[in-house]
Amino acid sequence: MSAASHIHSVACRLSSSFLASPKLKLHPRLSFFFHSSSFRNHIITRSVFCSSSHLSVRVSSYHSSVAAKATTSAMGDTATDAGMDAVQRRLMFEDECILVDENDHVVGHDTKYNCHLMEKIESDNLLHRAFSVFLFNSKYELLLQQRSATKVTFPLVWTNTCCSHPRYRESELVDENALGVRNAAQRKLLDELGIPAEDVPVDQFIPLGRMLYKAPSDGKWGEHELDYLLFIIRDVNVHPNPDEVADVKYVNQDQLKDLLRKVDAGEEGLKLSPWFRLVVENFLFKWWDHVEKGTLQDATDMKTIHKLT
C-alpha cells in the first residue's frame, strides 16, 4: 500500500474514532461537516513513517483552524456575540432566509445570522428576499414603528410598519402573486405588532414593487435584501412585542415630512432605517397619493427590480 493510501486510511479511522466518542456532542451543522468527505480530504500530515509493521501519522493543526471556522459559521462568534439579546440570538440561528440572485430567482438558503454578517455579504454576495409592510388606517395615516433596542441591525431607528424576511419553507416560498411573501407579512404583523391574521387577510396585501439595496448597520452587521414593498389599508388594534418594537405611531404625509426634517437636522436623536429612507425618497409619497385616491392598483409594478444600492 502506498504512503498516500496509508494516510487516507488512517485519516478515516481517526475521524471515525473521534466522532464515535460517547462524550462528544456536536451541533448538527458541525456533525454534518465532520462526517463529510471534505473534512477527511483536508487532513494534512506533518510526517509519515512507513514500515512493514508501523505507520505513524501526525495530523497538522489545520484541523483546529477548519473546525474553528465551522464552529463560527454554525454557532456564531461567541466572544463578539456575548451581548446579543437571547431572543434575537435564537432567531438568528432558527430563521432560514431565502437566498436569491439579483433577478429574484431562489438559489438556496442560509441562517439569518449569516445573511446579516457584512463579511459574508461581501465575500459570498449573500442576497436574501425580504419584505416591507406599509399599513394605512381608514384615515390614510401610515403606521410607523421604532425598532427595539435589542435588534441586532439598526436598533431604535424609525421605519415602516413591519420589515422582515420570508422563511425558507413551503408556505413562504410561493412566487405566484407574491403569495409566499404575503404569508410571511401576515405572520410577522402578529409576531411584532400583535395584529391577528384575520385582521390582515393575505389577499388584502398589495405588492407594489421590488427594490434591491445594501446597507451596513455597524462594523459587523448589515442588510443586503431584495425587498418586496407591500401596502395594506386596514383599521387594526396594535399590541407591540417589546422584543421587536420600542414604539409605534400613525402619521399623515405632513407629519412624516416633519419627521424627515428632524432626522436630517439631527434633532432628538431620531434616525430612519436605510430601506425606509429609500422608499420615502423614491416611491412613498406618490404611492400614498394613490392610497388616498383609491387607485393603488394603478401604481403596481412587480416586473421591475429597482436597484438602489
UniProtKB/Swiss-Prot annotation:
The record's section on Pfam families has: NUDIX
Q: What is this protein called?
A: Isopentenyl-diphosphate Delta-isomerase II
- Superkingdom of the organism of origin: Eukaryota
Question: Which source organism does the UniProt entry give?
Answer: Camptotheca acuminata (Happy tree)
Q: Where does substrate bind?
A: K112, R147, K151, S164
Which family is this sequence assigned to?
A: Belongs to the IPP isomerase type 1 family.
Q: Which Gene Ontology cellular component terms are annotated?
A: cytoplasm
Q: Which residues form the Nudix hydrolase domain?
A: 126-278
